[in-house]
Amino acid sequence: MVSYLCMSVSSGWLSIGKIAIKDGKCDPKNGNLYAIGEKWYNDEDCFEITCIQGDKGSVAQQVASCPVHAVKPGCELVFPGGTYPKCCPYYECPKLVI
């Protein structure tokens, strides 16, 4: 009998970068404008993006993504899909039955 143990790590990474600005809002060129503090999601790459106040009154984007996992021999890396953080991959490893 084989069963699976599912585990995920909640910490990922954050980056802050430039973004186009229109009318004082973040313009990710997706047809929407986002005010400071608003979030949007990139489901394809499993990102959460937040429009933030940058240096000297500028506007920037903060991107949160999933943690990077080390290879686990004998385990399967699962990509569940969905919106961040539910889309973050995790390992399913066979559970030893004693």
Swiss-Prot record:
Keywords: Disulfide bond, Secreted, Signal, Toxin
Compartment list: Secreted
Keyword Magnesium: no
Pfam families given in the database record: SVWC
Annotated GO CC locations: extracellular region
Major localization class: secreted
Name by which UniProt lists this protein: U-scoloptoxin(16)-Er9a
Biological source species: Ethmostigmus rubripes
Family: Belongs to the scoloptoxin-16 family.
Signal sequence annotation: 1-24
